[in-house]
């Protein structure tokens, strides 16, 4: 295992096939304090397989993969909020936009995984301009965030 106390450093590039990535990988990278990580955050796959307008219709496999990717079920509170419109029977859950999910995951990388610096992610679009991924950089070094912010700003 790479450890900060041994002065080892590593760069980890994570490009998961959809939601097929375990949170434990990101958690270990952050807690090692020795790994800088690029992550393609698969927001399109999340929308296709786990975060639907009607959360009750999402297949169990999609929910399970999202939970494994996120690390726990807290993603549900991020992905859905109670509707502000009155409903006489029970509160209706409304799907939140991608930016809310991305912002919450950025905070999760900082607060839960332990990365000190997580750059504002860059949306990666396909040929029809739909966002497929968000490219994250998570690091322990402020200079890494500064460099990536400078590079990403050229593509926003």
Features from the language model and the residues they span:
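Class I S-adenosyl-L-methionine-dependent methyltransferase catalytic core
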Residues: 1-156
């Amino acid at each position: 295992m790479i450890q900060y106390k041994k002065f080892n450093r590593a760069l980890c590039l994570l490009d998961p096939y959809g939601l097929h990535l375990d949170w434990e990988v990101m958690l270990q990278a952050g807690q090692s304090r020795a790994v800088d990580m690029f992550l393609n955050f698969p927001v399109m796959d999340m929308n296709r397989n786990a975060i639907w307008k009607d959360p009750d219709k999402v297949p169990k496999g999609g929910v399970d993969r999202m939970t494994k990717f996120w690390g726990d079920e807290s993603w549900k509170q991020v992905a859905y909020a109670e509707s502000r419109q009155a409903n006489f029977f029970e509160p209706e859950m409304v799907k939140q936009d991608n930016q809310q999910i991305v912002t919450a995951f950025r905070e999760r990388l900082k607060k839960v995984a332990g990365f000190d610096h997580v750059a504002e992610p860059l949306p990666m679009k396909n040929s029809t301009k739909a966002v497929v991924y968000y490219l994250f950089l998570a690091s322990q070094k402020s200079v890494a965030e500064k460099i990536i912010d400078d590079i990403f700003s050229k593509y926003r």
